[in-house]
Amino acid sequence: MSITIRPYRDSDLPRIQQLTVEAFEPVCIDRNIEDRFGVIAGRDWAWRKARHLTGDAEREPAGIHVAENDGSIVGYITTWSDHEAGIGNIPNLAVDRDHRGQGLGRQLIAFALDVFKAAGLSHARIETLDQNSAGQNLYPSMGFREVARQIHYCLDLADRPSPQE
């Protein structure tokens, strides 16, 4: 496998959205919400999760890098840098199912960490859900330390009385 990591191009968005939906299906907050409440506002969890990539591309397109194997995108990482706080953030990382378990996620994270370090940042953040065992194994193996656990809640507003006018 000959992997090249290159900067994101606008034309990459559909493919990285596809990778996102495939990779995050079993470990996505939006999927958990849909499993509990059903489809919301006519938009399924996959639409919501793919939309996160649109937001990443709008916020900091230079922070997205894709991994190619023989010209095909097989993974990506999104990052954004808070230079004032000295922290680099990794909101999304996905690898094509046929390329998992071969070190590509590790390679993409290492690439991002090198970018953060070269930019003068002092720390990097990444987060994962409790149900994402791959992330929980990978991130500590790369030196990340768990600092907190978070619980996510959702409320169906149809169950709430209308405000008085």
Where are the regions that the model predicts?
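Extreme N-terminal starter segment of soluble prokaryotic enzymes
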Residues: 2-4
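Acetyl-CoA-dependent GNAT
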Residues: 7-11, 18-91, 96, 109-111, ...
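Charged catalytic carboxylate motif
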Residues: 15, 107, 134
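Conserved acetyl-CoA-binding loop-helix of GNAT-fold acetyltransferases
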Residues: 95, 101-114, 137-141
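Conserved beta-strand-loop-alpha-helix junction that forms the acyl-donor binding cleft
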Residues: 100, 126-136, 154-158
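Conserved GNAT acetyl-CoA-binding A-motif
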Residues: 116-127
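Short, charged/polar, Gly/Pro-enriched secondary-structure boundary elements
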Residues: 160-165
